[in-house]
Amino acid sequence: MALRAERNACQKSAEDVLGRAQILMKKSIRLTVGQALVRFVAKQYVERDGRQNRFIEGFWGIFGHGNVSGLGQGIVECAQEEGLRFYRPQNEQGMVHISAAFAKHRNRLSTFACTTSIGPGALNMVTGAGVATVNRLPVLLLPSDYFANRVPDPVLQQIEHPNERDVSANDAFRPVSRFFDRVSRPEQLLASLPEAFRILTDPAETGAVTVSLPEDVQAEAFDWPTEFFEKRVWHVRRPLPERELIKEVVSRLQKAECPIIITGGGTIYSEAWPELKAFTEEFGIAVTETQAGKGALNWNHSLNAGPIGSNGGTAANELATEADLVLALGTRLTDFTTASRSQFQNPTIRFVGVNVAPMDASKCAA
């Protein structure tokens, strides 16, 4: 028995050695985390309806304590080589708003990454993160964080919490981000960054994505597998509704006496305005607009009733008061759209939500 146990131990040891050898034999490149991050984001592309483009157009950032020698150096050394531009704003909150606005303009198929220093520089991005997440707009946030090894402790602008030593200013990003990760080792990015981009490029999950980067980790060198930097194309999906649900919607439309359409930002992001125009003209259903949905149907179209809700117009709001069926296309049905659910007065009203996000599609008991 002892001999067999010794033989098994030797076999296990040999397997471990072979496993490590296979890892070492893989092609690798030695880069700092800052350099690797720039090269990785440059290779991330999206594709929808056969059209393909780079997802991260460049970086916005204000350099200071925490990101100068890490991501800052990586941007200086690698961004131009990779075809990424760098822009310096006057305020961190502003650069997140700019990135979200750019993503909106590009129908969520492109955005920017934003880098900041530790503490107040990072906290200035929190409001922008909340706006991006609420409005389903992709932005990649890379705030700097205190030293992962905690040898320099405390450091400038560190929150010295008396009971929770792992808390930093960047924890404020957790409730306003669709994805949050604080990395403490370079190799953790091998799993974290692909997941971050999966969420950024998913129309149902997108919003602010935050990867918190300790300043020592940013400057740490690591042997990265070269396959990590190969071009990756993320397919932007167009999920199809179930046939039974379509039949139910058709049945409701046939029975409705005063249906209206509320078109939101999703109609624009999905480039569905030709289908909206064809549908409303075919069936003669009036279209009302949310703030994000403005422009989905030409302003001078005979069936465009204009903005709806608390800050809406008379025509749209009078139609909403009498409507017995609301077809909500790509809208979050916010309080401004529904006037805090007081806009619709017909006791028999029903809602149909058409949205890639189940949470938004099911609002107002749709």
Identify the residue ranges that each predicted region occupies.
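Basic polycationic patches enriched in arginine
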Residues: 4-7, 20
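N-terminal alpha/beta PP-like core and its mobile active-site loop of ThDP/TPP-dependent enzymes
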Residues: 13-366
